[in-house]
């Protein structure tokens, strides 16, 4: 969607209530964070997301949503051309520049991610190694030690299921964000 790239990036990091009208992050970034949170909620509630979370059982069930999100990022990067005419590399470069332009340095007390490094991070999701790097990063942010990296094997083994879910989930998320009526489910069309 057309929203703040910095807000989308900060959506998982910035916690608590945000009022865009008074936020030190600025109205555009604050709105981007709120949109990111809405998209996350909608994605987590999507039937295909729920189905993919079912692939992870036992002690990993608690982290299934995170792994599915990263697995879907991997699937989207791998199937990018099916959803966007702009090459992934060009998109990643454009997005990294936008993040830098919007970044609320004063409010956060730190600089935006380096353009080239951030663009490589995004395009890195095309490879399984990009997914494992993301899972390792999540491990470092968790309060309790959890070994998430091996769960990438499940995503790889179920790659077709993840790649098949990307399109319907994206369509439904865009429809919800743009307030369009839902498309009939496959079973309803038959």
Identify the residue ranges that each predicted region occupies.
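Alpha-helix initiation/capping motif
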Residues: 1, 26, 46, 83, ...
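An N-terminal structural lobe/cap that precedes and organizes the functional/catalytic core
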Residues: 1-80, 154-189
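Short, surface-exposed acidic
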Residues: 22, 83-85, 146-148
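Active-site-proximal alpha-helical scaffolds that flank and shape metal-associated catalytic sites
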Residues: 52-116
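An amphipathic alpha-helical core segment
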Residues: 90-175, 179
């Amino acid at each position: 969607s057309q929203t703040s790239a910095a807000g989308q990036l900060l959506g998982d990091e910035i916690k608590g209530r945000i009022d865009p009208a008074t936020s030190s992050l600025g109205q555009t970034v604050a709105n981007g964070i709120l949109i990111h949170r809405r998209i996350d909620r909608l994605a987590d509630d999507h039937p295909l997301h729920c189905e993919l979370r079912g692939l992870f059982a036992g002690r990993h069930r608690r982290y299934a949503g995170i792994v599915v999100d990263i697995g879907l990022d991997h699937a989207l990067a791998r199937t990018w051309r099916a959803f966007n005419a702009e090459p992934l590399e060009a998109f990643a470069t454009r997005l990294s520049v936008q993040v830098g332009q919007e970044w609320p340095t004063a409010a956060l007390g730190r600089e935006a991610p380096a353009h080239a490094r951030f663009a490589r991070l995004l395009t890195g999701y095309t490879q399984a190694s990009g997914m494992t790097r993301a899972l390792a990063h999540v491990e470092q942010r968790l309060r309790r030690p959890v070994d998430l990296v091996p769960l990438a094997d499940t995503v790889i083994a179920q790659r077709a299921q993840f790649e098949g879910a990307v399109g319907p989930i994206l369509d439904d998320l865009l429809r919800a964000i743009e307030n369009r009526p839902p498309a009939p489910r496959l079973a309803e069309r038959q």
